[in-house]
Every structure is written in structure tokens, then in C-alpha cells.
């Protein structure tokens, strides 16, 4: 599908100018044309507009369980969350709109646009995402790192429980490495 869109701009902030730009859209999603080929891209949340509503509802949840119910809206494409309540419950969730993709492909690489079976239609349910609720260790850590090392080792989600096609990151951030090197006592003392 090819169309044209007019974009009004101002040159140097003074001179009005209208630019006409070609817009290409495929069954996979928007298309970017370059000198070396055309690339369609598809990402979760590309039509999602409910983030403000979800933030609002999250702020009024009175318990981890109420918060989890709000999180089932799944309006955020990717955002790690940690929450706690007055009853001492804590939770980490690698919250994302993770596509349910066809197995057998390296989803980090370019894939053939001619194969419509590669157009994913669904995302993982909230309750199927990597999460830790009330770990025995008593703590969770979130520093933009893998969801498989967020608390004491016995309580971490098992990467083998998730398909490779989910694309969950296995890398550790520097802050996460430093945070996990501290024991709980040192971690608590560093914040007080």
C-alpha cells in the first residue's frame, strides 16, 4: 500500500514549506525504503494508546494483586516494573508485549517479507511473562538487565521455560552486576 502525506515545515523557523513524502505500508507493517532494499517492520504496541490510563490505574492499586490486574491491560510495549504493597508483598515483572512468534527463525536478523506465516498476531499474556513474586530472598533488583537474574538465584525465572523466539535479553547491565554482588544487608544499608 503506497500513499502520500504532506508535511508542513518551517525552514530556519521562518519560511513555511510543504514537503510531500511517500508512505509505504505492508501486511508486516510500515516499510522503510533504502538504496539497498525495502524493510518492513512490526513491533508490539505500534497501535497501543492506553498507557496513560494504565499509569493512572496502577497508581491507585492498593495491593500487588490489584496492581497485577491493572497490568493485564498490557498497554506498555516494554517496561520492567517492581511493585510492593503495605502487606509486605513484592513483585518484579519483565513487562512487555512479547510477540508469539514462529519457532525456527533468528528473530534478531532480517526475515523474508514474502513469508506471511512470519507475521505474528498475538503477544504473550501478562501472566506468562518472566516475573518474581514474594521471593524467599526477600528482595528484587531491576536495572535494565535480563529478567532471569533479578533476585536470589533459587527464585529467578528459568530461561528454559520461555521460547527462544520470545527474544528475552540475557545480558547484564553494569548496575545489575554491582547490585547482585551486594548481599541483602549491604543493599539495605546502601539505601539508608
Describe each region flagged by the PLM.
Residues 1-192:
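Mature extracytoplasmic enzyme cores
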